[in-house]
UniProtKB/Swiss-Prot annotation:
Subunit annotation: Interacts with the minor capsid protein p17 and with the hexon capsid protein p72 capsomers; these interactions form a rigid zipper structure that stabilizes the capsomers. Interacts with host IRF3.
UniProt-recorded name of the protein: Minor capsid protein M1249L
Role of this protein: Together with the penton and the other minor capsid proteins (p17, p49), forms a complicated network immediately below the outer capsid shell, stabilizing the whole capsid. In addition, blocks IFN-beta transactivation mediated by the cGAS-STING pathway and regulates the transcriptional activity of IFN-beta. Mechanistically, suppresses the phosphorylation of host key adapter protein TBK1 and degrades host IRF3 in the cytoplasm.
Naturally occurring in which organism (per UniProt): African swine fever virus (isolate Tick/Malawi/Lil 20-1/1983) (ASFV)
Localization: Virion; Host cytoplasm
Tree of life domain: Viruses
Length: 1249
């Protein structure tokens, strides 16, 4: 606390800061700042920052001294408390008549002039770097409010006397109350309690509207909008400088500031804070949202301008997109009404016109085409129907019956007894008693009240009935019969046939409960049988539609008990390859029994194999299944060395007999095609998706079909055809997902997004099933917001208009669903985002991307037209950077112009497509031509550029990549060497074809049979003699780990030959061979490497480039058939595979070592072969036991000088020291286990469980 003592010495203990005048305060601040200058202590930094506000703080508190004449504040006590605990609250105490500091440990009520101001939740706020967690309107807060306004206790009003808040309220009042602004002029805007209440009310309405989250796309952008300049700290007298204080701001800028301010408010947890005075929410929201912090946060002016420009562009583009969306929705509705009321003939004709090549997608053109195709009476019919759809929704929206609140309480109740009481109140409103077949209607309003199954469900829950009991009793409301459908494996969930709500779940275990003989002893085997049976369906041909899951379930039930009865099968949770092979055999035997049974009993479903006739002999099927089994499961069979083809055939025969003996003739029941097809379609997620959307937009009734006629109408509306028509088309099964609505998939996605948002709200508000939110309320909300942006002074009228469309969910909840309305769309194109499954590629003419010269369009010129015809000029074309400077609200964006070809965007369909294609083809030809001659010269060799021009062929460097700046030079050079280019290109292609294509000889010779491999030990002896080592060392490659090197040289302690294809020795030797071959190929093809291995580059550094290219010709290819032979031996004979790899390594070494010509290659290839093989052997030696290896191979520096360098002593190499790098190296070694005690018990615990 030395800093406190220093300050106390300066200030003098007991000094009352309220007794100091302004000059004394400034001198005191300067003295303290100079004393603490250069201090890095965070508390001192906070204190220095806080001293900026000391004078204003004292002046504000001194203003309150008139009411509290004995008010005092000891400076030392204040500073000491500030340093100890920065989270403080200075408060005024009437009893002690002093200003004191206390920690903010509980909710405070700040008392000033007898007025209680209750304070909301804690919000951190930063005042010039001093972080205070203020829970009350402290003197600091009021002092800060003094900068942007004054709080007058006499009237409890908010007077805009401060410059910043004056301008802000002017802006805000411009938006919400134009009349008040004109009436009060440029003086004080809000002076009375009545004005404050009116002002606050307007603010709350606007705040609720934006708080709902529907315009987050704009608010997030505006979050970057900081409207105040950087604070000039050198001038302590002027604290805040506002942009709007000295400039005349356009209405659009004012609107952005309002929305930005509301964005700050939207971070709060509740709309209305707790307060005792009912007209103070604005002050609390200003405080809680941290708006003061925003004012004090310095922002660079350049960033401000960039943010403003970008925001203006986004707002302009958004206006265009919103208008497009509004017109598109109307056009879609018109189109659907036309299809339903007039017929599909005219709608199909319109669709053909709209999808013509070169036609721009314009919703206005859809409306025009629809009206044009109809007569006067038909047009009136469509318009009238469109208005009727709106009115139907308005009736539901205006419903304010008391039963809505009761249903909400019923579905959101937390206790069953409480819900039961509410149910009794609802039953009084039933129009009919004991109704169990349809909705219970409200006798007061006539709308749907409650589904009967919900009534029964509440009673069962209150009686604490079991889940099985509830499921059984609720089944009478199910639209699907459990007994008829349970064995087909199709139905897993049951839904109410009245309201569509889910009743119960039926999972897989419910339908296969009879498989309890074995239980879950081997769930892995059960899953294996099920999966392999499903795979077998790929080659099985069923005569009619079947449920393949049911087919697999039966296979599990049939095969699993028989497999467990086999004596030599382990009854363990982990199954070995033998168990898997038995499972495959029994699966194929089950398939054979189905085929055999279908031949014997014609009532069974015909089952055969793809490509085979149904009446084929049983032997033919057996042959096919055996071949299929041995091919597809060769990996399992190869792991079992004792398994032969005869063994598989014998067990397959036994399995077939057991299945026939246990099950007899077995077949799949022939199902009704109509029933199977309709069931699969109705349960398909895409059908449910399309039907849901069709209900939302009014194409089909909201309720589930009650009669066969309604069901057929729904099916035909969603799919586009009746079930009978579908069954007449055999290929339909592969095209289930072809819907009538597919051309309007984007619109469906929008409506579906609304639906799911509404569903979540429905659950939240108690599940009123009868009410659905229409498209209208969302379109109306956006229409309102657009009008608000365009005509802010009339916001009150628009808000009143919006009230007409507010439904029973409440305005805020309805708009909350709007949030996801456009989430899945690209805001720039208005179409589905490409990252979603809703995205579809649209066929566009090539002229929409390229102009007639083959250049891509650049839409960087904005074309604006005057809104008012009297405005001059009538049209303005500006670049993106000049939009803010030259465009005001008198102009609207009309089109975009390409800066390359100067065509308007809506005129791209008029470009000559053939010219575009020809130009693109020519551009591609030029690119290929000049890329070919980028470095090679058509005159031979490489280009010889001098002054950017090749002296041999005349090619200029600047036309290689730029074909447009000098078109004459480009064409002249191309025409001069086009023939040469064609010849060289064909020559290269012919050479490549000779390499890739083997030309058959005139006389076809039979391919020579590859002789079986036999081991040649002489190759190992010859290699060992050259290397001067024991042949046993070469034989031990891959098997030196943990063996003494002395034993290795003598051939003692060698492990037995490998018996598994996964033996690590096989992988080690194979890796050594691959490394040898890789490095050899690097040497052989070194001319093609930019950075070959370092030591290989050293071997050939003295060779010329031509000699390096010739290495590929003079050096032989030693790879041959190594990889193929090794893979075969590894599976069939692992021991031979190990010997083969070692022998191949020796053969490759000897082939290279014995090369004798050309002479300039001999030394290079011998050094390479010796280096490679020695490196492989030395790497293996590192794995042998310590003490048996000569570490001198690493050089003398590795061995400690003066120590015994014996090959048999481990102390021959130095251990890490105790200081410096030795310790660091030891700590950083990731493989060091010196200090780890690994016992056998630990290793046992690490074994897989």
């Amino acid at each position: 606390m030395e800093e406190v003592i220093t300050i106390a010495q300066i200030v003098h203990r007991g000094t009352d800061i309220l007794s100091l005048n302004n000059e004394e305060i400034e001198a005191l601040v300067d003295e303290i700042r100079s004393t603490l200058k250069g201090s890095n202590d965070i508390k001192n930094i906070r204190l220095i920052d806080f001293l900026f506000t000391l004078k204003d703080f004292v002046n504000h508190v001194r203003a309150e001294q008139s009411k509290l004449p004995n008010l005092s504040m000891p400076m030392e006590a204040y500073i000491r408390q500030l340093l100890v605990n920065p989270d403080v609250i200075p408060i005024v105490s009437e009893k002690k008549k002093e200003l004191r500091v206390r920690p903010s440990t509980r909710k405070e009520i700040f008392l000033i002039n007898g007025t209680h101001l209750a304070v909301p939740a804690e919000v951190p706020i930063e005042i010039y770097g001093l972080k205070l967690r203020l829970k009350t309107f402290s003197p600091q807060c009021f002092m800060r409010m003094a900068e942007i306004g004054s709080f007058l206790p006499e009237t409890l009003g908010y007077v805009a006397s401060g410059a910043n808040l004056t301008n802000f309220i002017r802006v805000f009042m411009k938006c919400v109350d134009q009349e008040t602004w004109k009436k009060n002029g440029e003086g004080i805007v809000v002076t009375t309690k009545e004005n404050i209440i009116q002002f606050t009310h307007q603010y709350i309405e606007l705040y609720k509207f934006l708080r709902s989250g529907g315009h987050s796309w704009l608010i997030n952008r505006l979050a970057e909008e900081m409207v105040h300049r950087k604070l000039d700290r050198e001038d302590q007298g002027s604290h805040i400088s506002s942009v709007i204080e000295t400039e005349e701001i356009e209405p659009e800028e004012n609107i952005k500031r309002v929305i930005f301010f509301l964005k700050e408010l939207s971070t709060m947890y509740s709309v209305f804070p707790v307060f005792t005075s009912g007209y103070m929410p604005l002050l609390y929201d200003l405080y809680r949202a941290g708006y003061l912090e925003v004012l004090w946060n310095p922002v660079e002016q350049k960033f401000l301008q960039h943010a403003e420009q970008r925001e203006k562009e986004q707002m302009i583009l958004q206006q265009v997109d919103m208008k497009l969306t509004e017109v598109t929705t109307q056009a879609r509705q018109y189109f659907k009404i036309m299809e339903e009321k007039i017929g599909r003939v005219q709608s199909d004709a319109i669709r053909e016109i709209l999808t013509m090549e070169g036609k721009v997608d314009d919703p206005n053109s859809i409306l025009q085409e629809v009206i044009k195709a109809c007569g006067k009476q038909e047009a009136e019919l469509i318009t009238t129907e469109y208005l009727n759809i709106k009115k139907q929704w308005e009736l539901q929206e205006k419903n304010a019956c008391a039963h809505l609140k009761l249903v909400k309480q019923l579905r959101s109740g937390l206790q069953y007894a409480e819900s039961l009481k509410v149910l009794e109140s609802i039953r009084v409103l039933y129009k009919e008693k004991n109704n169990t077949t349809n909705w219970n209607l409200c006798k007061a309003c006539g709308f749907k009240l409650l589904c009967p199954h919900v009534d029964m469900l509440i009673q069962l829950q209150a009686a604490e009935a079991s889940y099985d009991t509830m499921r059984t009793k609720l089944m009478k409301f199910s639209g699907i019969n459990k007994e008829k459908e349970n064995n087909q494996g199709l139905i897993y969930s049951y839904f109410c046939k009245i309201c569509g709500e889910e009743l119960a779940h039926f999972v897989q275990e419910d339908r296969t409960a009879d498989v309890g003989v074995i239980g879950d002893l081997n769930s892995k085997l059960r899953i294996f049988i099920w999966q392999e049976t499903m795979k077998a369906c790929t080659f099985i041909h069923f005569g009619k539609l079947v449920d393949v899951k049911q087919f697999a379930n039966i296979a599990v039930n049939v095969c699993l008990p028989l497999i467990y009865n086999i004596e030599n099968i382990k009854k363990e949770e982990d199954y070995d390859p033998l168990t898997q092979l038995y499972a495959v055999i029994y699966i194929y035997a089950y398939i054979l029994n189905l085929i055999y049974s279908s031949q014997k009993n014609k009532e069974f479903l015909t089952i055969t194999i793809h490509g085979m006739k149904a009446d084929s002999s049983l032997n033919a099927y057996v042959t096919f299944l055996l071949e299929k089994m041995t091919q597809q499961y060769s990996g399992i069979i190869n792991q079992l060395s004792e398994i032969t083809d005869q063994w598989i055939a014998n067990n397959f025969r036994e399995a077939f007999k057991k299945i026939i003996h246990q099950n007899g003739l077995q077949g799949l029941s022939v199902q009704d095609d109509t029933k199977v097809l309709l069931t699969e379609i109705l349960l398909d997620p895409l059908y449910d998706y399309a039907a849901t959307v069709a209900r939302i937009d009014g194409s089909i009734p909201m309720h589930k079909p009650q009669t066969p006629k309604e069901a057929e109408y729904e099916f035909k509306t969603v799919i586009g055809r009746t079930p009978t028509e579908l069954l007449s088309q055999k290929e339909f099964y592969d095209k289930i997902y072809t819907f009538k609505y597919r051309p309007d998939f984007t619109q469906l996605a929008r409506l579906n997004d609304i639906y799911f948002q509404e569903e979540s709200l429905r659950v939240w508000w108690g599940g009123r099933d009868e009410e659905k939110i229409s498209t209208l309320i969302y379109l109306k909300a956006y229409e309102l917001f657009l009008k608000y942006l365009q005509n802010a002074p009339n916001f009150n009228l628009e808000l009143a208009e919006f009230k007409k469309y507010e439904n029973a969910y409440g305005e805020q909840r309805a708009l909350l669903a709007q949030q996801g309305f456009y989430n899945i769309f690209d805001p720039n194109t208005g179409r589905a985002d490409q990252r979603t499954r809703l995205f579809e590629y649209k066929k566009l003419p090539i002229s929409t991307l390229y102009d007639e010269k083959g250049l891509p369009h650049k839409w960087t010129i904005y074309v604006y037209k005057a809104i008012d015809s009297s405005q001059k000029p009538a049209e303005i074309e500006v670049s993106r950077k000049d939009v803010i400077k030259k465009i005001d609200n008198h102009y609207a964006l009309a089109d975009l112009r390409c800066s390359v070809c100067h065509v308007l965007q809506h005129e791209v369909g008029q470009l000559n497509i053939k010219k575009v294609q020809t130009a693109l083809k020519a551009s591609l030809e030029f690119n290929t031509f000049y890329a070919f001659y980028e470095s090679r010269c058509p005159k031979g060799g490489l280009h010889d550029f001098q002054d950017k021009k090749c002296v041999k062929c005349g090619l200029f460097t600047y036309i290689i990549y730029d074909h447009l700046s000098q078109p004459e030079l480009v064409h002249d050079y191309y025409n001069n060497y086009k023939d040469q280019y064609d010849k060289e290109k064909m020559s290269i292609h012919s050479i490549q074809m000779k390499k890739d294509i083997a030309v058959p000889s005139a006389e076809t010779q039979p391919e020579p049979q590859q002789e079986p491999w036999t081991f040649d030990y002489g190759k190992i002896i010859k290699t060992a003699k050259i290397l001067d080592i024991s042949p046993a060392v070469i034989e031990a490659i891959g098997a030196m780990e943990g063996r003494s090197y002395a034993d290795i040289k003598e051939g003692q302690g060698a492990p037995p030959p490998p018996t598994s294809m996964d033996d690590p020795r096989l992988m080690a030797v194979d890796s050594a061979v691959r490394i040898f071959l890789y490095n050899y190929n690097c040497l052989r093809h070194i001319s093609t490497f930019n950075k070959p291995p370092m030591y290989i580059e050293r071997l050939v550094k003295h060779l010329s480039y031509e000699e390096k290219e010739d290495l590929e010709k003079v050096l032989p290819n030693v790879v041959n058939e190594y990889h193929t032979t090794f893979k075969q031996l590894r599976v069939t004979d692992p021991a031979s595979a190990l010997l083969y790899s070692i022998e191949f390594l020796c053969i490759s070494f000897l082939t290279l070592y014995e090369i004798k010509e050309p002479s300039w290659v001999v030394n290079i290839i011998r050094e390479f072969a010796l280096t490679e093989l020695n490196t492989i052997i030395q790497s293996e030696k590192l794995l042998s036991k310590p003490g048996a290896f000569n570490f001198m191979i690493f050089g003398e520096d590795f061995v400690c000088s003066g120590e015994d360098s014996s090959m048999d002593d481990i102390s021959a190499y130095s251990s890490p020291g105790l200081f410096g790098e030795d310790i660091i190296d030891q700590l950083d070694d990731p493989f060091s286990i010196e200090d780890v005690d690994i016992s056998l018990d630990v290793l046992d615990n690490l074994a897989p469980q």
